[in-house]
Amino acid sequence: MAKPEKVSAVAEITEQFKGSTAAVVTEYRGLSVGNITTLRRALGEGATYSVAKNTLVKRAAAEAGIEGLDDLFVGPTAIAFIKGEPVDAAKALKNFAKDNKALIIKGGYMDGAALSVEEVNKIADLESREILLAKLAGAMKGNLAKAAGLFNAPASQMARLAAALQEKKAAEGGAAEAPAEAATEAPAEAEAES
C-alpha cells in the first residue's frame, strides 16, 4: 500500500473504532469468501466485519484512544465493529464460530475497555435488550398489580366491615322492634280480658 492509501485506511479504521459501541477482534484464517459473506449477513445491519492489516489497525486503535488490544492484532485479523447493541453481534459471532472452527474470537473492547475472549462470550450469552426489557416490564406489571391490590385492600375491608355492621344493626333493630310490638300488644290483650 502506498503511503496516502495507508493514511486513508488508518483514518477509516479510526472512525470505525470511534463510531462503534464495541468491537470484536477475530482470526479468520481458513474462512472462504462465502463464509465471511455469511458471517456479515448474520451480524446484520448493526455491525460491519472488516479484514485489516495489523499494523494499520494498531495505529488506528491508538489514534482512537483504545488501549489494550495490541496483543490481539497478530495473524490474519478481522474486526466486527458494532454500532448498536453488542449482545446480538457477539451472539452471531459466537454461533458462527461454533459452526466454523476456522473463526477464532480473540477478544474485543466495549465502553473503552479491552475484553477477553471469556468476556466476549459472556456478552454473547446475555439475552437481547428487547427480551430483558420485556422481562423488566412484566416484573414491574406484576409488582404494580400487587401494589394496587394492597392499596385497594384497606378500602374494601372497610366497605365489608361497614356492610357487616349495617347488617348487624338491622338484625338487632329487628329484634328490638319485635319485643316492643309484643309489649304494646300485651296491654291490648289485657284490656280485652278485663
Curated annotation (Swiss-Prot):
Pfam families: Ribosomal_L10 (PF00466). The keyword Ribosomal protein applies. The keyword Ribonucleoprotein applies. GO terms for biological process: translation. One of its GO terms (cellular component) is large ribosomal subunit. Residues 172-194 are annotated as: Disordered. Keywords: Ribonucleoprotein, Ribosomal protein, RNA-binding, rRNA-binding. Residues 172-187 have a biased composition (Low complexity). One of its GO terms (molecular function) is structural constituent of ribosome. Part of the ribosomal stalk of the 50S ribosomal subunit. The N-terminus interacts with L11 and the large rRNA to form the base of the stalk. The C-terminus forms an elongated spine to which L12 dimers bind in a sequential fashion forming a multimeric L10(L12)X complex. Belongs to the universal ribosomal protein uL10 family. Forms part of the ribosomal stalk, playing a central role in the interaction of the ribosome with GTP-bound translation factors. This is Large ribosomal subunit protein uL10. The lineage of its organism: Bacteria, Bacillati, Actinomycetota, Actinomycetes, Mycobacteriales.
